[in-house]
Amino acid sequence: MDAESTDAMYDKQKLLNWFFYLAPVWFLLETFLWPGFRAGVVTGGNAWGNALFYSVEAGLGAAIWYKMPYAETSALVENVLYLIFVLKFILFAPLDIALSMEGDSGRTAEMIKNYHASLPGMLYSMVFLVYKIKNRVSLN
């Protein structure tokens, strides 16, 4: 791998790390404007759960910013765990929506809205993992 493509990869990773640095902004966004953006998949939209989720993300952001040992690995592990929850959500949420269609249409509409709202957070985690794993493989 030449130096120019390696530098470009590091620049993309630095850009992806800003997601962690801006965790308080994402928490406010999810709390007031976009419920279910990212933490809602894991916490079900609970405000305290969201606060805990974004506290972990902010802590990872601080660790990455200060170049703490294992910060990048911890961020990778956090995103892998998040994607495990996402996989469960992707597989079972449509079944829950289908089962709720018969009785309660208000709840069904809310579940559909939450499903759509969480897609950008899922996509971000997938992109993050691809770049981090690609970097780990290229360094070895």
Whereabouts are the PLM-identified features?
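Topology signature of small-to-medium multi-pass alpha-helical membrane proteins
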Residues: 2-140
